[in-house]
Design a protein with these regions (language model features):
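Acidic-enriched, low-complexity/disordered segments with a strong bias for Aspartate over Glutamate
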Residues: 34, 43, 55, 61, ...
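Signature of long, low-cysteine stretches enriched in small and polar/charged residues
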Residues: 6-29, 59-104
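Surface-exposed amphipathic alpha-helical segments
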Residues: 1-11, 55-71, 106-135
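Solvent-exposed coil/turn segments that connect beta secondary-structure elements
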Residues: 42-44, 92, 106, 116-117
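A short acidic-to-branched-hydrophobic micro-motif
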Residues: 25-55, 101, 109-113
């Protein structure tokens, strides 16, 4: 993924309730001027068999809720042959959010861009989103 800066990476183990199982999340945030770029993915424990559509929707919903945003659009699609969900959201009256979640095997990958609300930034968003490569 091409980002306008070299972001620090954060990885953390997230347990599932009181169970010993869980997942490891990996996130990088890049702030460039008044735009924020996010790349993330999750590694689940061995043997986890997700319902792909439910996983895509849960990633979207958790992200939108975590950002305290309102979902505006959502589209089921594919990215490089893998199931994907693209969506937009609005965070209050300050930020527009454009995001894609792609499911490759048991690993969901997410890209997101936050831009000032109502400003036309499609060139930056499109360049970032198009740079995603899944091996």
């Amino acid at each position: 993924v091409m980002m306008p800066c070299v972001p620090p990476w954060k990885s953390e183990w997230v347990p599932r309730g009181n169970a010993p199982s869980g997942y490891r999340s990996h996130i990088a945030l890049c702030k460039a001027a008044d735009e924020t770029y996010l790349v993330g993915w999750v590694d689940y424990e061995p043997g986890y068999a997700p319902n792909v559509q439910a996983e895509l929707e849960a990633n979207r919903d958790n992200f939108v809720n975590g950002m305290q945003a309102q979902l505006l659009t959502t589209t089921n699609t594919t990215w490089q042959g893998f199931p994907a969900l693209e969506f937009t959201a609005r965070r209050g009256d300050t930020h527009d959010i454009t995001s894609r979640v792609v499911m490759k095997a048991t690993r969901p990958y997410q890209l997101a861009v936050l831009t000032p609300a109502g400003q036309h930034r499609s060139a930056n968003i499109d360049r970032f989103m198009a740079s995603q490569r899944l091996k």
